[in-house]
Amino acid sequence: YKYVMEAPSMYFAPVYPNINREDHTIFGNKSGGPIGSGGFSIYRNPYASMVQGSSKQSAYTINTAFELEQKLDFLTKGLNFKALVSFKNWSKTTVNRSFSPYFYELQNPQEQEDGSYLYDYNSISKGRTALETSTSTTGDRLMNLQATLNYQRMFGDKHDVGAMLVYLQREYNLNNPDNNYYNTLPERNQGLAGRVTYAYDGRYLAEFNFGYNGSENFEKGSRYGFFPSLAVGYLISNEKFFEPLTKVISNLKIRASYGLVGNADIGSNRFPYLTKVDLGGAGFVFGDQWQTSSNGATITTYGAEKVTWEIGKKYNVGFDLGLFNKLSLNVDFFREDRKDIFLRRNTIPAESGITGDLRPYGNLGKVRNQGVDMSLDYNHAVSKDFMISAKGTFTYAKNQYMEIDEPDYEYAYMSQVGRPLNQYKGYIALGLFKDQEEIDNSPKQILTGVVQPGDIK
């Protein structure tokens, strides 16, 4: 539809009558347009663009999953094992068929006595009637393996113990990789996760988690990271001394947690520890042969040694409050200190020649994010057939750079340290210049040319 606005509708008709009995459709057009075609500058004909071809896509997805579950009570009560293998294969084929329109420009139209027109047209862009066909195929394969050992058991009336151990493995492949060597290699991830929980008499709660995860994007010795966490809670409303208050305060729980989380998502920058070399480099000059250039290998990106996981330290303190079994308030105060953030280096001198994409990556940044999360729920059953429910949420968060790889700026205000992420920077307007005297007595204005009264100061 955007082509409709490219040329006035009176410039040409979508098609003209085939008065010369051509073996193709006579699409209208006009010379002098913004598009080059066959030695002419023409306009787009929206109707021709609409009918000149078609595209057909066929997509197929195969999902397969095998699951095995076995209770192991014969070893110890409450123990069970589960294994899951899943496979997905997706493919899409696109077939495009089109022809190149013949465009003609109207010549010498003459109105006749009966109101009709006598005219001719001139070819300004030759096309082809034969259909041109192109086909493309894309797709991917994903395989997941998960094995889980789970344990849950109650000892006596008060001790509730649980444990879980999970092994994860993932492999992702492209069915039709391009000429990029990295895209021909499978993407693989592997990890082991565990959890231990304990609850005493429904009042005192504790949970320990860990993750031992591996990513192929890092070199040997840096591929695996260990990320533990610990959480505790106290359900005060289950205490005996709290029973007189339960008609009003139906639930009261306080909780706290601390843990480490890892991030290996570095976008499309696979294997950043490898230096990338292009064997088809050109334009090299040696010695005094400055008029002669040679071909050879060139480095496109320098590898980064010892690049590893981003690590975030998370702190959380909160409480849950329930009133009259109808109103629920959840409040969480949180803070995350993230370090070893994956960034390109910005402090390499330009004189070294290592600029732009040549710059290596590194674990360079530190960021702090903190704030509060709140949610309020109201549920009231008016009758067995009618219920009133409402929910509201509130979040306040503030982040800032604690450390970042940046030049040693002359002025402190130019640094990003202590400032929010992605903060906009700009000049602060001090008002408008009133007269020429004020302009003459002000610092030089570098954003405009000649400054006049009324301009922004």
Show where each model-derived region lies.
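Extracellular/periplasmic, surface-exposed regions of secreted and cell-surface proteins
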Residues: 1-98, 106-428
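Extracytoplasmic gating/loop element in the C-terminal half of outer-membrane beta-barrel translocons
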Residues: 47, 423, 447-448, 452-455
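Glycine-rich N-terminal loop/short-helix segment of MobA-like nucleotidyltransferase
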Residues: 295, 330, 438-447
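Long C-terminal tail modules that include membrane-anchoring/sorting signals and adjacent low-complexity
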Residues: 411, 443, 452-457
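Intrinsically disordered, low-complexity terminal/linker regions enriched in Pro/Ser/Gly
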Residues: 427-431, 436
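Alpha-helix N-cap recognition
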Residues: 435-438, 453
